[in-house]
Design a protein with these regions (language model features):
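Extreme N-terminal starter segment of soluble prokaryotic enzymes
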Residues: 6-9, 32
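Pre-active-site segment of Zn-dependent metallo-hydrolases
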Residues: 18-21, 28-71, 84-91, 95, ...
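Short beta-strand scaffold segments in enzyme catalytic cores
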Residues: 21-26, 126, 146-147
Length: 147
């Protein structure tokens, strides 16, 4: 009998059928990476609420499996939830120069200092645990975006 193939799980925690809260989990074997970590802004009827972040319950239950967060670009709907998530799950963050510059500013506002930022050039490939992540330059309304 042949070996049973290992499955890849793709789990969107936000950003599907909505604007904002972009966050996707890729799970393989016993490891996970997070793609983006965004927020959204409240609907008109959500009085008293300033921001909305994805539900990270699944991440908290599996935080030992998380190997890193990969950022595609520096818009709030892709990086805005980072300070809230990193207070509970501190893992390395991978992104391009401008993206990480915006992240650093956000962390200063939130008084976060014990973070590991890993700068990656567009076109580079990075090994993150079981994952091989290629940063492909992408055209977007903000410079230094990657897919």
């Amino acid at each position: 009998m042949g070996r049973k193939p290992t499955k890849i799980k793709i789990i969107p925690l936000g950003g599907l059928k909505e604007i904002g809260k972009n966050m996707t989990i890729i799970e393989y074997k016993d490891e996970m990476i997070i793609i983006d970590c965004g927020l959204s802004f409240p609907e008109d009827e959500m009085l008293g609420i300033d921001i909305v972040i994805p539900d990270i319950t699944y991440l908290l239950k599996n935080k030992d499996k998380i190997k890193g967060i990969v950022l595609t670009h520096g818009h709030e709907d892709h990086i805005g939830a980072l300070p809230y998530v990193l207070k509970k799950i501190n893992v390395p963050i991978y992104g391009t120069r401008l993206t990480l510059g915006l992240v650093e500013t956000k962390f200063k506002e939130h008084k976060l200092s014990n973070v590991h930022l890993q700068r990656v050039e567009a076109g580079a490939t990075v090994d993150i645990g079981e994952f091989k992540v290629e940063f492909i330059r992408s055209s977007h309304s903000i410079p230094d975006a990657c897919a």
